């Protein structure tokens, strides 16, 4: 199945500083497509794929061309050129089971990436020590996850083994001010997590252990 939804969003902002005043309203429609695919190989084996898209709007404070210098050492400037972010999320599932062998397999994989994320760009004034921060769009934020599960019976089906393996990877980007070049560099942070859970059990007509 496939579908597309448009989600209306209404925002209002009132800003006043001295004689300067802004009173504005924003109305947008957020685009949110989705795809859901399922295929059944048999009664005990199936595949499923899911896709979701999500739009994220910049805040009104970030969009308006306002210079907030109420703190002279921490100045914030809005950015009217900010684009909405859009996140792609995909998930894949597969499972199968053999009743005769009492053996099952489960897999799950997912991936998510965001276009036009918002990160703060910061500039420093060496003479005054002031810091000016402006929100800007940035690309490169994504993550991936994978899981493999396996369980089976052994030796007259009195023993069972269960295994779950997980892997998770994160790739995050942000602006980082370079003191030497006086410009922002794209800073990347990555993280990898691996985990394994293995257990066994024994069962007979009298008791179960594990």
Where are the model-predicted features located?
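Exposed, low-structure sequence patches enriched in small/polar residues
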Residues: 1-210
């Amino acid at each position: 199945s496939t579908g597309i939804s448009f989600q209306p969003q209404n925002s209002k902002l009132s800003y006043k500083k001295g004689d300067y005043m802004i009173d504005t309203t924003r109305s947008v429609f957020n685009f949110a497509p989705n795809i859901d695919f399922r295929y059944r190989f048999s009664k005990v084996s199936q595949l499923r794929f899911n896709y979701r898209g999500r739009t994220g709007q910049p805040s009104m404070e970030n969009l308006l061309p306002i210079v907030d210098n109420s703190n002279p050492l921490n100045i914030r400037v809005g950015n009217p050129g900010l684009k909405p972010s859009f996140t792609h999320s995909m998930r894949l599932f597969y499972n199968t089971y053999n009743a005769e062998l009492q053996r099952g397999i489960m897999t799950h994989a997912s991936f998510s990436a965001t276009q036009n994320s918002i990160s703060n760009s910061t500039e420093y004034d060496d003479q005054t020590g002031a810091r000016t921060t402006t929100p800007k769009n940035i690309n490169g934020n994504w993550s991936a996850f994978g899981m493999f599960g396996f369980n089976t019976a052994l030796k007259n089906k009195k023993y069972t083994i269960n295994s779950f393996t997980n892997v998770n990877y994160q790739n995050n980007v942000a602006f980082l001010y370079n003191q030497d070049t006086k410009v922002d560099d794209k800073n990347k942070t990555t993280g990898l997590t691996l985990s394994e859970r293995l257990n066994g059990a024994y069962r007979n007509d009298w008791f179960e252990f594990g």
